[in-house]
């Protein structure tokens, strides 16, 4: 109950913050800021190593894809697009992914900055390993999940107590180990909303160049799916996604907020199967929900694959040293390919601009 009260208070505070921003139709572009919320798990964090990005930006075979992001051999730092990614913030450039890495936010933010006269702020709320089923579970799904959480917690507490009776040190694989302790449902959803509130409340402190401007929440981008492949969570992904979209719009106070979904596609050129295919189909099915017509757009990411990273046994970037192969991470992270992440960011941007154009 206490958690519920705190969440309601957070939603009220966010709605009040957003209400201070003028509606898009009446916005004075000289005094507003376009804000885009980017959420998901590790791939929304961004997994393309900067060392590999630097290399491909100078390699004659790949440099054309990145030339608009560079000037005089260096990465451009935007003075009209800003980003907040958890504890980090600043003008948009490379490096706003996981440590020493970059994600789809770079190309997406570039496109938004080039399209709008107003400054742009990206709020990135992403945490590796978090599922829509659990951590990103939205409020309208919580009541039915709370019972399961209590059951899981009771089971774990019993196992934990039994393990402690065997000795103070609990084996790593013992079901009573802390790593198996059930996590609260909706924790990342609430943290995501808190990121929005913090940015709206403290924007002028975070980004002094935006002093005196009003923030306008303009769109949402979702890039997630991997952790819903387990425990049968994929079977309810479509329902969970529908609830999530509706709840986000309700809690942020923007009824038809443009919502882009980068559908799961780590399979690349290999046909998707099993839970991965189920999740992708659920994500793509959002295009067919009648009430989402014209305000939700899902697209496939597997068709954007950087095929060079699918070569047998690609060598990774290790210990900061670039071993000149195109893959910078494992398959679950889109091979850590700067090309793949850039293509995904571009597709995100195209989808967002299409939705926004249709709403005018």
Regions flagged by a language model, labelled:
Residues 8-17:
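Bacterial N-terminal signal peptides
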Residues 26-360:
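Cell-envelope and extracellular/periplasmic
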């Amino acid at each position: 109950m206490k958690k519920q009260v705190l969440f309601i208070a957070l939603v009220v505070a966010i709605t009040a913050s957003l209400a201070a921003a003028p509606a898009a139709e009446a916005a004075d572009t000289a005094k507003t800021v376009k804000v885009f919320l980017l959420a998901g798990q590790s791939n929304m964090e961004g997994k393309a190593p900067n060392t590999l990005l630097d290399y491909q930006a100078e390699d004659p075979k790949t440099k054309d894809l990145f030339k608009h992001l560079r000037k005089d051999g260096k990465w451009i730092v935007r003075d009209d697009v800003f980003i907040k990614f958890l504890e980090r913030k600043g003008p948009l450039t490379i490096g706003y992914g996981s440590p020493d890495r970059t994600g789809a936010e770079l190309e997406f933010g570039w496109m938004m900055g080039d399209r709008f006269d107003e400054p742009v702020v990206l709020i990135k709320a992403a945490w590796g390993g978090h599922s829509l089923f659990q951590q990103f579970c939205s409020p309208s799904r919580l009541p039915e999940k709370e019972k399961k959480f209590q059951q899981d917690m009771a089971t774990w507490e019993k196992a934990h107590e039994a393990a402690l009776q065997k000795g103070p040190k609990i084996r790593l694989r013992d079901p009573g180990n802390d790593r198996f302790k059930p996590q609260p449902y909706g924790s990342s959803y609430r943290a995501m909303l808190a990121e929005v509130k913090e940015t709206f409340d403290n924007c002028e402190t975070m980004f002094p160049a935006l002093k005196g401007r009003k923030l306008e929440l303009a769109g949402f981008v979702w890039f997630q799916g991997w952790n819903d492949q387990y425990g049968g969570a994929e079977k309810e992904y479509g329902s969970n996604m529908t609830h999530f979209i509706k709840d986000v719009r309700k809690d942020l106070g923007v009824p038809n907020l443009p919502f882009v979904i980068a559908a799961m596609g780590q399979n690349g050129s290999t046909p998707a199967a099993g839970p991965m295919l189920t999740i992708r189909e659920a994500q793509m099915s959002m295009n067919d929900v009648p009430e989402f017509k014209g305000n939700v757009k899902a697209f496939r990411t597997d068709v954007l694959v950087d095929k060079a990273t699918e070569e047998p046994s690609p060598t990774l970037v290790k210990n900061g040293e670039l071993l000149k192969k195109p893959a910078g991470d494992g398959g679950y992270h889109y091979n850590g390919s700067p090309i793949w992440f850039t293509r995904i960011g571009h597709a995100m941007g195209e989808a967002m601009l299409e939705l926004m154009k249709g709403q005018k």
